[in-house]
């Protein structure tokens, strides 16, 4: 597991507990980072309006899961995920689902707490059809192979310096001002040899 995963989880929890007067801010992760740092990664449809708990501290969305990419062991004996939980207010990183299309599938990466799937506005949630073919391949079968040894290392300002040979420098934000650049949409940080990771293309090979 990436050494940054516990830190990321801690930051996420801190954001969750932040007072409502402070806005929630976060840097979108590379999709491989989202996969590796999440307990559950699924494809699902949002099929119900949000339901609020009695104190309105959190809400839940009913979903219909169509595919699981990660989390078989974490889920245990539970046959399915029917709800996603999130803070009720966007100011404390609550996720707000804007699409009204209940047949649209989404890639959802979240944390499993007390047997429930939790997400925030900082979580990786994206329409499945908005992902590149390389990203879909990554979530389906490739990203998992890089989780143990490799780390996507964000570079947001110059100078950038890798801290380990197992890091891949992610420069999309720096070069394009977007987290949806070429490295995010087409590359994965994968082991090349023991103790070394490099960017590898996930673009479909032409026969």
From Swiss-Prot:
> Can you summarize the PTM annotation of this record?
The activity of TIMP1 is dependent on the presence of disulfide bonds.
- Oligomeric state and partners? Interacts with MMP1, MMP3, MMP10 and MMP13, but has only very low affinity for MMP14. Interacts with CD63; identified in a complex with CD63 and ITGB1.
Provide the protein name. Metalloproteinase inhibitor 1
Which family does this protein fall into? Answer: Belongs to the protease inhibitor I35 (TIMP) family.
Where is the secretion signal located?
Answer: 1-23
Q: What is the lineage of its organism?
A: Eukaryota, Metazoa, Chordata, Craniata, Vertebrata
Protein's cellular compartments? Secreted
Q: Which GO terms describe its cellular component?
A: extracellular matrix; extracellular space
Q: Which gene encodes it?
A: TIMP1
